[in-house]
């Protein structure tokens, strides 16, 4: 038997500090064998295509200091996770790049001589010991797969299940949702949307222009049995605290 902790979109440095602290404490408590980051690790507003939508893009020498500062801020937060993962001796670590993370790669496509700014290189994933997957490349362990997230809309969990046709866990949409189906040969299969760890306030999400959302703070625990089957626990984080196996964890 092995256990994994799965975290959804963090959007560092626009994260919810109390939610992140809950997850860090949960890692210490659970002591997982596997750690899976579903991506959108950074907000990456410095390289967002929306940044210069209504104004002219400045010369590169004006862009780089802001990009460098955001990379530094994101790495500082990743370091916090690596520190606690090292402490509990969790060696198997996976990173599944998200669409926001892909913005760094798009920046490098425009500036191919700046390869050090790719998401993989800027966050030093290989150096950190993570197995790296590009945006929506699928990770499969036993009888469940993991991906950043490919579909949105009201029925995104159902759409992920129908398109992938297997047990699938993803982030991307920031809400907690599940859809299940039964197949004649495969039995019950499900899709889990895992919420986010992002600051959900209107002040930090001005692009919503005051619209309400259905986002939730959460993380997942997956227990893998020797048969390849598994058990999923979606742990909701409510106002900076959660209940985990009879223990109250406060961020």
Set out the residue ranges of the language-model regions.
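Conserved beta-sheet core of the metallophosphoesterase superfamily
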Residues: 143-235, 240
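Active-site neighborhood of divalent metal-dependent phosphoester bond hydrolases
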Residues: 47-135
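Hydrophobic/aromatic residues located in beta-strands of well-ordered beta-sheets
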Residues: 35, 93-95, 191
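A short acidic (Asp/Glu
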Residues: 16-17, 45-49, 104-109, 157-158, ...
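Beta-strand-turn-beta hairpins that frame and shape the catalytic cleft
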Residues: 1-5, 138-145, 227
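Active-site flanking residues adjacent to catalytic metal/cofactor-binding acidic residues
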Residues: 8, 38-40, 97-98, 147, ...
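Polar, enzyme-active/binding microenvironments
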Residues: 29, 233-249
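N-terminal active-site segment of His-dependent metallophosphoesterases
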Residues: 1-79, 247-251
């Amino acid at each position: 038997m092995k256990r994994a902790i799965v975290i959804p979109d963090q959007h560092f440095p626009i994260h919810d500090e109390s939610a992140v602290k809950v997850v860090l404490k949960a890692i210490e408590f659970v002591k997982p064998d596997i750690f899976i980051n579903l991506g959108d690790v950074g907000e990456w507003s410095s390289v967002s295509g929306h940044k210069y939508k209504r104004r002219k893009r400045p010369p590169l020498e004006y862009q780089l200091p802001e990009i460098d500062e955001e990379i530094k801020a994101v790495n500082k937060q990743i370091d916090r996770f690596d520190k606690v993962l090292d402490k509990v001796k969790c060696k198997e670590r996976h990173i599944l790049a998200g669409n926001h993370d892909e913005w760094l790669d798009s920046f490098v496509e425009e500036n191919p001589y700046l390869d050090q700014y790719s998401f993989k290189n800027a966050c030093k994933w290989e150096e950190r010991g993570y197995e790296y997957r590009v945006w929506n490349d699928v990770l499969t362990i036993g009888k469940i797969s993991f991906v950043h997230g490919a579909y949105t809309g009201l029925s995104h969990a159902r759409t992920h299940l129908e398109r992938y046709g297997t047990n699938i866990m993803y982030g991307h949409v920031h809400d907690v949702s599940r859809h299940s189906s039964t197949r004649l040969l495969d039995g019950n299969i499900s899709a889990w949307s895992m919420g986010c760890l992002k600051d959900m306030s209107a002040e930090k999400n001005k692009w919503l222009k005051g619209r309400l959302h259905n986002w939730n703070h959460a993380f997942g625990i997956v227990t893998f049995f020797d048969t390849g089957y598994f058990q999923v626990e979606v742990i909701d984080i409510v106002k900076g605290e959660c209940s985990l196996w009879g223990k109250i964890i406060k961020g």
